Regions:
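Short glycine/acidic-enriched loop and turn motifs that connect beta-strands
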Residues: 9-12, 72-73, 116, 156-159, ...
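Loop/turn-rich, solvent-exposed surfaces of beta-rich toroidal or solenoidal domains
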Residues: 6, 50-62, 67-72, 278-280, ...
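Conserved blade-ending motifs and adjacent loop-strand segments that build the rim/top face
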Residues: 36-42, 88-98, 134-137, 305-314, ...
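Beta-propeller fold detector
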Residues: 27-33, 84-89, 129-130, 173-177, ...
């Protein structure tokens, strides 16, 4: 039986005891011990829980390390009257990432399983967990022209799964109105938001339709078409255009997402995610039999001959402001190449490998994304199989 009791920060977690007489008597530590963040401020609202292992340092019997569900805590004075535990995880957090967005001139925002996601000034610094405390998140979108407006989705059968913020994550609002006519709880899936931030989109994970709202989730309308779409993205310039993809089709909308038309020329696979070119209208990249590119709002696509295979694509900052954006892919240029992370600085004409065969990180995992940084040239992020978000930098 699991018994959870209050810890010093008011959160409920495991009970911890010490004995100094070989186990004849035990002293509860929860009302005596102290806890600190160890410089990782998001942990201040968490507890030590799901403890699976503890180890005393054989060279220093005052020091003990405790494995918790959120990382590792260490105490250097376990035998004192008021021992202090501090968070000791430095980059070993085992998280399942679902998406990450690099805001041009702004922050880095992610969504993950279990712990909402993070808001960071840079990848090198510890960020803060979303204060929504909503749990597992599966989708994230940020308005291209109103970058303080973010939407995300997740939740479960017990809790409505759509959230939004109008102030860059300072305050999150949970939308409790279901888009379903039945009123049943909607959760999971993917989200999008128009470039001006005025229209929210949601393709719940427990439904096959796309819904949109013009009043921040107070009411929802079902889109016509786009059935089965689980990836949605809005044009970064023209709010009339919205793009969507399912496991078997690509769709585009010319009326702001009210109706979707299927593009009949593409063969797609379930995990493929469309990507739009930053600051450009109508330029869409889509993994399909290699990498496909559209310059007419998704109506027609042209395959890049320079790639034999592409499972994910992302765009990042160019070398200078006048240079085109960089393109990152998970795939391979020729059939003789190995699958991995590649990048192009010339709009896909030539490719250079970023990863190596010893560092594949299990592939793209649940999130199935490759994302370029919009503020640092040469930086790229990729999802993994339970290893968090991995990033790489160009070595000058």
């Amino acid at each position: 039986e699991n018994i959870y009791v209050p810890q010093p920060n008011g959160q409920y977690g495991d009970e911890f005891y010490v004995t100094t007489d070989g186990g004849k008597n035990w002293t509860l530590l929860n009302d005596k011990m102290k806890m600190s963040s160890g410089g990782v401020e998001w942990i201040t609202t968490a507890s030590m829980h799901w403890c699976s292992s503890m180890a005393i340092d054989p060279n220093n019997t005052n020091k003990i390390m405790v494995v918790s569900g959120n990382g590792v805590f260490t105490c250097d004075n376990i035998w004192d009257e008021s021992p202090e535990f501090y968070f000791f995880s430095k980059g070993i957090e085992e998280t399942v990432p679902y998406d990450i967005i690099s805001i041009p001139g702004g922050k880095l925002v992610s969504v993950i399983a279990d712990y909402d996601g993070f808001v960071q000034d840079s990848a090198e610094e510890y960020g803060m967990v979303h204060n929504s405390v909503a749990g597992s998140m599966t989708g994230l979108a940020i308005a291209a022209k109103a970058t303080d407006i973010w939407v995300k989705c997740g939740g479960s059968e017990e809790k409505p799964g759509f959230w939004y913020t109008l102030d860059a994550g300072k305050k999150w609002v949970n939308v409790t109105v279901s888009p379903f006519e039945s009123g049943n709880v909607a959760y999971g899936g993917y989200v999008a938001v128009s470039a001006d931030g005025k229209r929210f989109f949601w393709a719940p994970g427990n439904d096959s339709s796309i819904y949109f709202s013009d009043d921040q989730g107070k009411t929802w309308t079902k889109s016509n078409g786009g059935v089965g779409s689980k990836k949605i993205i809005c044009d970064p310039v023209n709010p009339d255009y919205v793009y969507a993809a399912s496991g078997s089709a690509f769709f585009y909308s010319e009326d702001g997402g009210k109706t979707f038309t299927q593009n009949m020329t593409l063969s797609v696979f379930a995990a493929a995610r469309p990507v739009v070119a930053p600051g450009k209208e109508g330029v869409v990249y889509y993994p399909s039999m290699g990498l496909q590119v559209s310059t007419d709002n998704g109506k027609t696509f042209t395959r890049l001959d320079s790639l034999a295979a592409c499972m994910a694509v992302g765009l990042g900052k160019g070398k200078t402001d006048s240079d085109p954006y960089t393109i990152f892919v998970w795939g391979k240029p020729t059939n003789d190449d190995s699958i991995g992370l590649y990048w192009s600085e010339d709009e896909g004409k030539t490719w250079s490998k970023v990863s190596d065969d010893q560092h594949q990180f299990g592939g793209l995992g649940n999130g199935y994304f490759v994302v370029g940084d919009m503020n640092k040239y040469g930086r790229v992020y990729m999802s993994t199989v339970g290893l968090g978000i991995v990033y790489g930098d160009l070595v000058q």
